Swiss-Prot record:
Pathway: Metabolic intermediate biosynthesis; 5-phospho-alpha-D-ribose 1-diphosphate biosynthesis; 5-phospho-alpha-D-ribose 1-diphosphate from D-ribose 5-phosphate (route II): step 3/3
Protein name: Ribose 1,5-bisphosphate phosphokinase PhnN
InterPro entries tied to this protein: GK/Ca_channel_bsu (IPR008145), P-loop_NTPase (IPR027417), PhnN (IPR012699)
A UniProt-annotated Pfam family: AAA_18
């Protein structure tokens, strides 16, 4: 059975780096889904399809998102094309949201494989400061949010160390859960 890997983790945990590493050397039968976001394409961060609020509303009204949510002042959508990829036997990794995991579970059922990327608070704080997008108050809020318990059934993947180690661990998880 093809799986939808719902990758979550706090901002700064390394989700984008992990997805970039998978894109560079993808395992067989694995696709990395892009997200539709109401954020400029050149805003930095992940490779995504930038939509205006109006475009996002129109696509949502047409049922073109399998899952969508709002966070940090932006709207995010995972396109229905991911369901076609799954039907064709491809595993799909998406940059998901732990707060919207239940919505993804309702849509994808047993095909969903939630993976939660974690880093220690000290590493997370250092990464957030290094990227320079948040002030100290926002960093404190993100650290508090990251300290909340992970959802039940989420496989934990630590990313404190070298990215290559995390990629290797994720590949092992994918092999075990096919």
């Amino acid at each position: 059975m093809a799986r939808l890997i719902w990758l979550t983790g706090p901002s700064g945990s390394g989700k984008d780096s992990l997805l970039d590493a998978l894109r560079a050397a993808p395992p067989p039968r694995l696709l990395i889904a892009h997200r539709y976001i109401t954020r400029a394409a050149d805003a930095g961060g992940e490779n995504h399809v930038a939509l205006t609020e109006t475009e996002f509303d129109r696509r949502a009204a047409l049922g073109l998102f399998a899952v969508s949510w709002e966070a940090h002042g932006f709207r995010y959508g995972i396109g229905c094309e991911t369901e076609q990829w799954l039907l064709r036997g491809q595993n799909v990794v998406v940059n998901g949201s732990r707060l919207h995991l239940a919505q993804a579970q309702a849509r994808f059922g047993s095909q969903l494989l939630p993976v939660c990327l974690q880093v220690t608070p000290a590493v997370l704080a250092a990464r957030l400061r290094q990227r320079g997008r948040e002030d100290e108050a926002e960093i404190a809020r993100r650290l508090a949010r990251a300290a909340q318990p992970q959802p039940d059934g989420c496989l934990i993947l630590n990313n404190d160390g070298a990215l290559a180690e995390t990629v290797c661990q994720l590949r092992q998880i994918l092999e075990l859960h096919q």
